[in-house]
Amino acid sequence: MKNLTILGSTGSIGVSTLEIVAAHPEKFKIIALTAGENIDLLKEQIDAFAPQLVAVKNEELALKLEGMLSCRKTAVMYGVEGMIAAATASDTNMVVAAIVGAAGLLPTSAAIEAGKDIALANKETLVTAGRLIMDMVKTRGVKLYPVDSEHSAVFQSLQGHRKEDVRRIILTASGGPFLNLSGEKLAQVTVKDALNHPNWSMGQKITIDSASMMNKGLEVIEASWLFDMPAEKISVNIHPQSIIHSMVEYNDGCVMAQMGIPDMKAPIAYALTYPGRVPTGVKPLDLTTLSGLTFFNPDVVRFPALQLAYRAMKDGESMPTVMNAANEVAVAAFLSGRIKFTDIARSIEKTMDLHHPRSLSSIEDVIEIDQWGRERCSELLQSF
């Protein structure tokens, strides 16, 4: 029996995780849940899974939720303190880190410090504080399992093989909804257009990141930390069908690939049950029904965000933290209609140009640099 805390239970990953938990009650028990503002869905989850503790964004929402719970014995907390309490709950032995963005850093790092195994869906944790987090993982002796479909695919393709035999990691990308649009048309796309992903059902922020290809850039950085692999040994292939989720090429010329229908329940379940597997309800893959699988290199002129991620890795130190902070600010500005889609990468690059990388020796340093990046990007956007 695994006792779980889910950080971000009302988001796409959180909801899918709870579907797996509900299908296998003999394997999982929910100890704590956290959410932002969607307390109506959180109330349904409390009724279904009876957690000991839940945490929400602020005190106002916490009071409102308490009023909705009547005689439930679930404790309600709020803010960062509440998130950390959920992440470090004494009965929890695995934390599903599914909070979107840099907001997931503090509770995830607290969970690691408390000795909890991690199922990591929050890629920004490793993007912003990769060295610090991986050092904590080693020091505390915890297990960190990837939930992202691409990193799960790499993890599965590495099983039974030696790291020193790896020639390169190949992350696949669908290309998003704007794969074939010209640069001129990219400047005219709407929020509605950008949120219409062809293959995956995801939250708003990650869907926009997928459209800009920043999501793949973040995944390159995450893969570098997860698998201790330099950037030059991590490639990206556009694969519009999203059937092969990623590959590992070995020095003998063999390539191991993980395939499946695009459904996040599969990598979530693998992270929760490794090295075992459980039925997930994911539709079986029938290769005979596919017209073909195609692969090609990304267009970094039309989608410069991917190259910005490689630049951030090359610059190192605090630059990925600044890049991520600027991206979160720019995506929020696009979603609110304040900037054009093509302004996202432009504003990130300008923010990075203002930054001189410095070493990060603590999570507090990461938070300070993250704030710097947000402030600089916000200032830049005023002139767009």
UniProtKB/Swiss-Prot annotation:
One of its GO terms (molecular function) is manganese ion binding. Pathway: Isoprenoid biosynthesis; isopentenyl diphosphate biosynthesis via DXP pathway; isopentenyl diphosphate from 1-deoxy-D-xylulose 5-phosphate: step 1/6. It comes from the Bacteria. The keyword NADP applies. NADPH binds at residues 10-13, 36, 38, 122, 124, 203. SUPFAM superfamilies: 1-deoxy-D-xylulose-5-phosphate reductoisomerase, C-terminal domain (SSF69055), Glyceraldehyde-3-phosphate dehydrogenase-like, C-terminal domain (SSF55347), NAD(P)-binding Rossmann-fold domains (SSF51735). Gene3D superfamilies: 1.10.1740.10, NAD(P)-binding Rossmann-like Domain (3.40.50.720). It is an enzyme of class 1 (oxidoreductase). This is 1-deoxy-D-xylulose 5-phosphate reductoisomerase.
